[in-house]
Each structure stands twice: as C-alpha cells, then as structure tokens.
Design a protein with these regions (language model features):
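Interfacial loop-to-helix junctions that mark the boundaries of transmembrane helices
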Residues: 80-93, 232-243
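Transmembrane helix-loop junctions at the membrane interface of multipass transporters and ion channels
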Residues: 42, 63-89, 262-273
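Extended, low-charge hydrophobic alpha-helical regions
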Residues: 14, 20, 34-50, 159-285
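Juxtamembrane inter-helical linkers in multi-pass membrane proteins
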Residues: 2-36, 114-139, 218-232
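Selected transmembrane alpha-helices and immediately adjacent juxtamembrane segments
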Residues: 1-6, 86-200, 278-289
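Membrane-interface alpha-helices
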Residues: 5-12, 46, 76-81, 276-278
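Membrane-embedded alpha-helical segments of transport systems
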Residues: 28-34, 53-70, 91-101, 205-211, ...
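Flexible glycine/proline-rich, aromatic-decorated loop/lid segments
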Residues: 40-44, 57, 65-76, 111-121
Length: 289
C-alpha cells in the first residue's frame, strides 16, 4: 500500500489510481491474476482503466519469447556486453509497456472513461505477525492452481487444433501454411511475416506456445518444435528472413498484442460486459499493429 501511495501522484496524472501499480505488478506474473487484482481499486472507473490496460505489461507467458529473442539477436559481441545488451533490451521493452499503460490510461480518461481521479487515503493498520499458513494456502490454492487449471483447460484444445491444422493438407501444403500465406501481406506491412502472425493467433489460448508453433511452421515438422540452443534458433530464424529489426518488431508485438483467452475470460467475469471485454481486446491489438 505504501508503494501505491507514493506512486499515486504519477498515476493520477494519467487519470488512474496509485493502486493500479499493484495490479500491474501482478500482471507481470499473469495478466488474468492482474485483472483479478484490480478489485483492490474502489473507484469503478479507475478499476476499469486498470483492467483494460493490464495486458500492456508482459506476463510470464510472453517473457520467455522476449528473453530468448533478446539473447539470440543482441548477444553478438563476444564480450561481457553479451549479457548487458540483452538485459537492457528487455528492460526497455518493459518500460515501453509501462509507458503504453500510462498513455492509454490517459487517453481513456479523456475519451471513453471521463472522470476525476479519486483521492487516495492511506490507512496504516497496526503491525501484526503474518499468517504464513493462510498466505501460502491463498497463494497456491486459490490463485496459482486456479489460474493454471483454467489456462490448461483452454490451452490443451488449442494445441490439438494447431496440430490438426499443421497435419491436414490441401494440395501440397497444410492448412496452416495456406493461412500463413494468406496473412503474409499483412505481416510484411508491420515488419513481420505470415508465419509469425499465425503463431501469435495460435498462441491466443496460451502465449507460451508462440515460439514452438512458429518453429513448427518454419521447419514444417507437423509437431510442436523446440530448439537445441540459442545459436541454432538464431540460424533457423535468420534462414527464414529474420533480421534484428524483425526481432525487435516481434518483441514489441508480443508485448502489445491482444490478451490471451484466459485473461479475456477473466475480464468478462470481472466487468460483466462484452463491450469492455472487446475494448480490452481491440485497444492493445490496435496499438500492436
């Protein structure tokens, strides 16, 4: 609460509430959990702003892609800078996400969600010894396991559908390849390609499968594929036309694109509105493109 109180002045300039920084921090772990964490914000308007913008901070499903691309394309000096430059690039990506969150919050305050920021009154309760058992139970059972089970329930069917699309052929090409060719012009227009867009679409249920799906499409294996080393991954991607600029574009698109299905379901549950769920989908998608 003290951190939120200290940052309230900054967030108030964007028309948001200081407690939004806490839901953003939860979003770094899981955006669905971050959306649920927005319940701590009392003002309905500011709570809705926090819910809509929570996806603009990278979750643990998007961090692996960002980290591996930074390691593959920014560690090329052969010196101690190979550890510093990727770390700086990841930090910059996170800062872009935080900046986008504040910018979108400001725009929402001036357009769809007009209003005056509420007052943040910090109450200091008496210090008490933490109830370790209760905290562990709440964190593991009520939150972590619940979110993981819900994510697994959505991701498993998506993996099966992706496998089918990659193994059902129309002519000499699979349906997945036909779809990638169809999306190729749009992908090229934003510095990506059709296969990258297909991978992100396939990753709608779970962002963790974006890179395996992309490698599957590039290598035409018909099964989710992993890579043996960073060097082998870089060679695969560069042989398919990737450059450092492509890697930067993919990292930014991963940061800013639409929420995963679990997050959208959570937004629908928290807001009870299809309109605001659609807004939470279309706003980051528009920013990403």
């Amino acid at each position: 609460p003290r951190v939120a109180f200290n940052l309230d002045h900054l967030f108030k300039k964007a028309g948001a509430h200081g407690k939004m920084c806490l839901s953003m921090c939860m979003g770094f772990g899981c955006n669905a959990a971050g959306v649920i964490g927005c319940r701590i914000i009392d003002s309905p308007r500011e709570r809705l702003i926090a819910i809509i913008t929570n996806n603009l901070v990278p979750c643990n499903g998007r961090f692996p892609l960002i980290i591996v691309l930074s390691a593959a394309f920014f560690a090329f000096t052969g010196s101690f800078l190979d550890s510093i430059i990727p770390a700086l690039s990841i930090t910059l990506i996170v800062l872009v996400g935080v900046s986008a969150t504040l910018a979108v919050s400001y725009l929402l305050t001036k357009t769809l969600l007009k209003g005056v920021p509420s007052t943040f009154t910090l109450e200091l309760p008496p210090y008490r010894a933490p109830q370790v058992g209760r905290i562990i139970y709440t964190s593991i059972i009520d939150r972590t396991v619940f979110v993981l089970l819900r994510a697994a329930a959505v991701a498993a069917p998506a993996g099966a559908v992706t496998w089918l699309l990659a193994n059902i052929y129309v002519g000499e090409l699979s349906i997945l390849i036909h779809a990638a060719n169809f999306l190729e012009p749009l992908g090229r227009a934003i510095g990506l390609d059709g296969f990258i867009l297909i991978a992100f679409i396939a990753g709608f249920p779970a962002n963790e499968i974006v890179m395996p799906v992309l490698l599957m499409a590039y290598m035409s294996t018909g099964a989710l594929t992993d890579y043996e080393s960073i060097d082998s991954l870089r060679q695969i991607l560069m042989s398919n036309g990737w450059t450092i600029l492509t890697a930067i574009n993919v990292m930014l698109f991963s940061l800013l694109h639409w929420p995963c299905s679990t997050t959208l379901l959570t937004i629908k549950k928290e807001t009870g509105s299809l309109k605001w769920t659609f807004a939470a989908f279309i706003i980051p998608t528009g920013i990403a493109f």
